[in-house]
Structure formats: structure tokens, C-alpha cells
């Protein structure tokens, strides 16, 4: 909760990753 901006970016990143996984798109973590 201290770094709201960083948390928001991480949240968005996770949402994108979940969306790709749902579509069955291969996703490699960087």
C-alpha cells in the first residue's frame, strides 16, 4: 500500500497475463 503506482502497474501486468493465459497464448515471464 506504500507504493500505489507500482502496485497499480503490477496489477495491470497480472491482469494482462491472466487474459493471455485465458486465450491460451504462450506467456514467458521476463
From Swiss-Prot:
Disulfide bond residue pairs: none
Subcellular location as annotated: Cytoplasm
E.C. no: 2.5.1.18
Residue ranges of the TM segments: none
Catalytic activity: RX + glutathione = an S-substituted glutathione + a halide anion + H(+)
GO terms of molecular function: glutathione transferase activity
Assigned keywords, A-Z: Cytoplasm, Transferase
Assigned GO CC terms: cytoplasm
Broadest EC class assigned to this enzyme: transferase
Oligomeric form and interacting partners: Monomer and homodimer.
Family statement drawn from the similarity comment of this UniProt entry: Belongs to the GST superfamily.
Protein role: Conjugation of reduced glutathione to a wide number of exogenous and endogenous hydrophobic electrophiles.
Protein name: Glutathione S-transferase
Organism, scientific name: Pseudomonas fluorescens
Amino acid at each position: 500500500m506504500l507504493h500505489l503506482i507500482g502496485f497499480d502497474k503490477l496489477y495491470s501486468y497480472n491482469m494482462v497475463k491472466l487474459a493471455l493465459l485465458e486465450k491460451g497464448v504462450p506467456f514467458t515471464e521476463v
